[in-house]
């Protein structure tokens, strides 16, 4: 009996030593992976998460971080597998559901993605990003009522962030509720004055209500912030064309030519129409 007990004790000590060594190596690999991940070296981070998981194949967070690493590199099928494994080991990880939802949407499974967004919101019902992510999915499906509901709730959670009021502005803009859209885009410019989108849409609103001076100011702001969008130049050309000055016509032609070089078919059609009307 004593011999058997001593044998069991020896076996337990050997097992404990093995587990301790595995934990030591796991932590070494995991900590190295985390440093690489923070440095945005996702390729090598993934390799160290691989090594960590060989030492501890039940560590849910390592699967999650490996999923994020391959997600960042654009390997969506592999990311999906690791998000699945994360959730199977830790079904309370709201971020895993949220990222899996985004991954599914990128893989053209929009409804599956929305179901994952639903779950992430059920786990963390006051997370701003979860609502804006689901709102964007609904927006892409043209489910504007549901999108607006999510963006409005997100905006109530945090009115200092840009994403919710911007998409709310888009929904109201395309519903031709220009007063509401304009107010939201103006709010966006105060939240982030470096984002060109709100200036662009404010320019389009002012153009639609024949306020060309303000429209020109706003589109100039958009182009100053981002000069590689053909639609910005087309919009400014349209504004110039409604002025009486021939100098403005010259600038409109210059803008249309810039947009054409960027591949804008609308600019090409506008320029052909302009000259077909007898302009020199």
Regions from the PLM with identified roles:
Residues 19-65, 72, 276, 280:
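N-terminal leader/linker segments that initiate helical-solenoid repeat arrays
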Residues 25, 241-242, 246-280:
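Terminal, low-structured helical/coil segments at or just beyond the last alpha-helical repeat
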Residues 25-27, 60-61, 94-95, 128-129, ...:
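Helix-start (N-cap) detector for alpha-helical repeat units in TPR-like alpha-solenoids
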Residues 39-47, 72-85, 107-119, 141-153, ...:
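Structural signature of tandem alpha-helical TPR/SEL1-like repeats
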């Amino acid at each position: 009996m004593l011999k058997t007990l001593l044998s069991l004790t020896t076996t337990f000590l050997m097992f404990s030593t093995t587990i301790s060594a595995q934990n030591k190596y796991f932590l070494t690999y995991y900590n190295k992976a985390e440093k690489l991940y923070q440095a945005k070296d996702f390729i090598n981070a993934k390799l160290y998460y691989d090594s960590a998981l060989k030492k501890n194949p039940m560590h849910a967070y390592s699967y999650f971080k490996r999923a994020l690493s391959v997600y960042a590199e654009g390997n969506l099928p592999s990311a999906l597998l690791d998000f699945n494994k994360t959730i199977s080991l830790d079904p309370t990880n709201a971020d895993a559901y949220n990222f899996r939802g985004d991954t599914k949407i990128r893989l053209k499974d929009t409804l599956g993605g929305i179901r994952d967004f639903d779950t992430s919101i059920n786990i963390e019902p006051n997370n701003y990003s979860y609502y804006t992510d689901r709102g964007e999915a609904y927006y892409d499906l043209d489910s504007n009522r549901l999108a607006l509901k999510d963006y409005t709730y997100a905006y109530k959670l945090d009115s200092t962030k840009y994403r919710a009021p911007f998409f709310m502005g888009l929904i109201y803009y395309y519903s031709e509720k220009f007063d509401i859209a304009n107010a939201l885009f103006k709010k966006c410019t105060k939240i982030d004055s470096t984002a060109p989108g709100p200036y662009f849409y404010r320019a389009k609103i002012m153009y639609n209500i024949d306020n060309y001076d303000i429209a020109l100011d706003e589109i100039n702001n958009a182009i100053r912030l981002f000069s590689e969008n053909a639609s910005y130049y087309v919009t400014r050309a349209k504004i110039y064309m409604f002025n009486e000055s021939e100098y403005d016509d010259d600038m409109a032609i210059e803008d249309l030519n810039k947009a054409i070089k960027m591949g804008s078919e609308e600019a090409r059609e506008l320029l052909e129409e302009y000259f077909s009307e007898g302009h020199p």
